[in-house]
């Protein structure tokens, strides 16, 4: 089976991001965005999805967090798309509700690649 990994680098006027993703990892996260809660959530994502995720991001967080959050999201989406390759054997869409800690998360995903 082909390794499902991806490395993404993105540099803009507001942010600089380096991201590595291994979809067949063991749930290891090494996250540094400068935004504590965001780091925590991304680490939990890696842990519970059982993929390895490494992110080093710096941005203009003194102005606002949204540039860093947005650009990390763009990089993570690109990494998943690249790591999945031709998507052979992957179910196109799914949904789930997960109660965790004091929250109920409802997730729906479609990886068809069609624009919204």
Residue ranges, per PLM feature:
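Structural preference for solvent-exposed beta-strand-turn elements
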Residues: 1-116
């Amino acid at each position: 089976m082909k390794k499902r990994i991806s490395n993404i680098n993105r540099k803009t006027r507001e942010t600089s991001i380096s991201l590595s993703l291994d979809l067949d990892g063991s749930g290891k996260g090494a996250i540094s965005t400068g935004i504590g809660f965001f780091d925590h959530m991304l680490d939990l994502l890696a842990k519970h999805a059982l993929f390895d995720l490494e992110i080093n991001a710096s941005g203009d967080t003194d102005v606002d967090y949204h540039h860093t959050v947005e650009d990390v999201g763009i990089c993570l989406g690109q990494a998943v798309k690249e790591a999945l390759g031709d998507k052979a054997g992957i179910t196109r869409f799914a949904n789930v509700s997960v109660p965790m800690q004091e929250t109920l998360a409802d997730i729906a995903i479609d990886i068809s690649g069609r624009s919204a």
